[in-house]
Amino acid sequence: MLDQLRQTGFDILTRNHAEAILAHDFPGDLNLLCKVIAEFRISLEEVIRGGGGEAGLTQRLRHELSDLNWRKHNFSVETVVDGRARAGISHEVDHVKFAEAGALALEIEWNNKDPFFDRDLENFQRLHALSAISVGIIVTRGASMQDAFLDRITDWMRGQGLSSEDELDRLGIGTRTAAQRKAVADQVARGMPFADAFARKFVADKFGQATTHWSKLEDRVQRGVGNPCPLLLIGLPERVLI
């Protein structure tokens, strides 16, 4: 199941026997999860219209997971001393699948600041230590998608014949700041085509290195963040963009 994702370009990384746990204890859930993720697509027009944010992009994926009973859940933990609650803390996870063998926790990090990975991994670590979850799963932008954004968005702009701010406004892509517009105008004044100037500024602002994407997640896991929780990490490849 995971091998099929690997063969079609998805970044897949597992830690602490997660792959064996999923295959043995959650084969049906893993199969359905892989199927939903393999079929997921993101429109470049949606990416640009939405200013790079989540909006409707990953909401479709969230709805599909919810339909499969991967629901938002708030884990509540209390410390009890001599029968009296002394302290309490909660851990909210966007998608949790409860099964007979245990629970799977999943977070989608499309385009947050990269410290959100620390939050997710540390949450998984604590929940696993409490035997509340069996595996933690994170889905984010893969390496090939991250590398392809500039070329793909530039090509889309050219294909749409977009060559001015007025044409962007016509498509409803006019909610950018004055500073962003000026940066594009300055590049155009230096001779850069409008589509190229817009794409460079857009990608730098929205999908920069300080946002959630594969290399940032991989780096944290290689350093041991989240250990010893079993982890499955999935990076969406360029082919998801249409």
What label would you give each PLM region?
Residues 61-69, 128, 214-225:
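Hydrophobic, Leu/Ile/Phe/Ala-enriched alpha-helical segments that form helix-helix packing faces
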Residues 95, 105-108:
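Glycine-rich active-site/cofactor-binding loop and its immediate structural neighborhood
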Residues 102-104, 135:
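Structural motif
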Residues 1-30, 158-242:
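Non-catalytic C-terminal interaction segments of nucleic acid-processing enzymes
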Residues 47-51, 60-101, 115-122:
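Active-site metal-binding core of divalent-cation-utilizing nuclease and nuclease-like domains
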